[in-house]
A protein has these predicted regions:
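Low-complexity, intrinsically disordered or signal/transmembrane-proximal segments
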Residues: 11, 524-525
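Solvent-exposed, acidic/polar segments of extracytosolic/periplasmic ligand-binding ectodomains
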Residues: 32, 523-524
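Start-transfer (signal-anchor) and selected internal transmembrane alpha helices
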Residues: 1-39, 118-119
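Membrane-proximal helix-loop-helix interfaces that form the catalytic/acceptor-binding platform
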Residues: 29-516
Length: 528
């Protein structure tokens, strides 16, 4: 059948519609990227640096310069650490500066997720995927933290998208693209290895490019192993791999890595809630540490609504990916990392925490995006509106409510610095690194909170520390794991006038004079 030629300078109607649709989708991706930038850069430096961020600063040589030996000891995140060191060299070590690399990675994640959505769940899921990525409170939180998780997510997303492309075309350029992205993810955080089941399946699965993929997989595997080889000695030294031996029973006397709950019964539900709502969509982390049951009761209505909405979207999303014949990928992407980290936690090798399975988050977002893509217009608008309201509340809390923020070491130490007299010192208890960072130039000593489990020993060592100088500023934070009963705080309260103790959002401060300290053998006596 003869098809008449189009008039000069014109295009077929279908091509015109396709071009217009592509332009609209590009504008959507750009708009979502702009929103992501606004959310991630807004008040980037308003929270204090907390203890985990201090580990990054130490590895980056701050204050000072990066040292190769410190990089080799940093088994998680040498790439991110180098970025932090570079930004600090150029712009200083303010909070917003050292967090800026994470924010930029979080912004770049939006177009990366657009690519991943297009090659995995389909073009119709791209728009919901980019908006979910832009607004996710969980992603905003880690984009505003001086840790490597935003880098990991960006590298893992790009590597997975590149891998899915190899099923269609496995040329040298496509393989190199995967290798570079996988290398970036590996050098950002070793949690990228949790995607090994999914990536191995995708390298080996049947298809027209299987032969080329098998050859390329060997080269890529050797290249990645060579890349991480400088960090292998540190991995062997830092982690106790014997704990992962099959059939090993955890001795009763073996201390948990983080208090009694290396693997809390609610760990997986909490991870799913955090993926959906971040750490400000319900009770704050400090509320949960103080009283999990009380925190859940106080926020039950909000938790129930979030669970209902995201539970429904999750169920619809699983049906949508099943219709696309992607359930095998989904199981390997979601279940395998959770099982691996659960095994680590059960053997007291690593604590179960949402950030340790963050490589599964892109899959969660794409499952929800598939649900939105398959909904009718009215249902899509209603559910999108509910999610937008829930996330707006969570993001506002994160930005403006101190109880949902990180511990406020900056305010605590500025007050100490303003009131500290000559000859006095600071005693950092619980998490000393942030106290030392914000107390630079002051005399700061450490006291190990783990001894709080032996009250007599605690009283003796604290008394000795407090009696060493005329006055001591005791700065206590993150005591939940080592001193859940609050023995140290109670002991200090009994010896300090009310006028000389105060708190600053997760940080408690006591100004203890030598004369305030009573005999360690009389814990109930008070000088007041």
């Amino acid at each position: 059948m003869h098809v008449p030629a189009s008039p000069a300078g014109s295009q077929p109607a279908t091509a015109t519609r396709s071009t217009a649709s592509d332009s609209a989708l590009t504008r959507t991706i750009l708009a979502a990227t702009l929103v992501a930038a606004l959310l991630r850069l807004f008040r980037l430096g308003h929270q204090s640096l907390w203890i985990d961020e201090q580990f990054t600063l130490v590895a980056a040589g701050l204050p000072g310069h990066v040292v190769w030996r410190d990089l080799l000891d940093n088994v998680h995140g040498p790439l991110h650490t180098l970025a932090v060191a570079l930004f600090a060299l150029l712009f200083g070590d303010a909070e917003w500066v050292v967090r800026l690399p994470s924010a930029l990675a979080g912004i770049a994640l939006v177009p990366a997720m657009a690519w991943l959505a297009r090659v995995w769940t389909g073009r119709d899921t791209v728009a919901p995927a980019v908006w979910l990525t832009a607004g996710s409170p969980f992603l905003v939180w880690y984009s505003q933290e001086c840790r490597n998780y935003a880098f990991l997510l960006l590298g893992a997303t790009l590597a997975t998208a590149a891998l899915f492309e190899l099923a269609r075309h496995c040329g040298r350029g496509a393989v190199l693209r995967y290798l570079l992205a996988a290398a970036a993810a590996t050098l950002s955080n070793l949690s990228f290895a949790l995607l090994l089941p999914l990536h191995a399946w995708r390298w080996l699965m049947p298809g027209p490019t299987r032969r080329a993929r098998l050859v390329s997989a060997a080269v890529v595997g050797a290249g990645l192993l060579l890349l991480v080889s400088p960090w292998l000695p540190a991995m062997g030294r830092i982690w106790d791999w014997s704990r992962l031996a099959p059939g090993r029973e955890v001795p009763a006397a073996e201390a948990g890595l983080r208090g009694p709950h290396t693997m809390h019964p609610a760990a997986v539900p909490f991870a799913l809630h955090a993926f959906a709502m971040g750490y400000s969509g319900g009770p704050s982390l400090r509320e949960l540490r103080r009283s999990p049951e009380g925190a859940v009761r106080a926020h039950f209505a909000e938790l129930a609504l979030a669970g209902l909405v995201f539970g429904l979207l999750g169920a619809l999303g699983l049906r949508a990916v099943a219709r696309r014949r992607l359930l095998a990928d989904t199981c390997l992407w979601l279940v395998a990392p959770a099982l691996a980290v659960s095994y680590f936690a059960a053997n007291n090798f690593k604590v179960f925490h949402p950030r340790y399975i963050v490589v599964s988050l892109p899959c969660c977002l794409l499952v929800v995006a598939a649900a939105f893509a398959d909904l009718g217009p009215r249902a899509r608008r209603v559910l999108a509106g509910v999610v937008a309201v829930l996330w707006a509340v969570a993001l506002a809390r994160m930005a403006f409510e101190p109880k949902y923020g990180r511990e406020d070491y900056r305010t605590a130490m500025s007050k100490v610095r303003a009131s500290m007299a000559a000859g006095e010192r600071v005693l950092a208890v619980g998490a000393p690194e942030p106290v030392e960072w914000y107390g630079r130039g002051l005399t700061v000593a450490r006291w190990w909170l783990g001894v709080a489990g032996r009250p007599e020993r605690m009283q003796q060592t604290l008394t000795e520390s407090l009696a060493a100088v005329p006055g001591t500023w005791v700065v206590l934070s993150r005591a939940e794991d080592d001193d859940p009963e609050g023995r140290c705080a109670s002991w200090l309260d009994a010896r300090t006038p009310v006028a000389r103790r105060w708190s600053a959002n997760g940080v408690q401060v006591w100004h203890v004079m030598r004369a305030d300290v009573v005999a360690a053998g009389d814990p109930q006596q008070s000088p007041n």
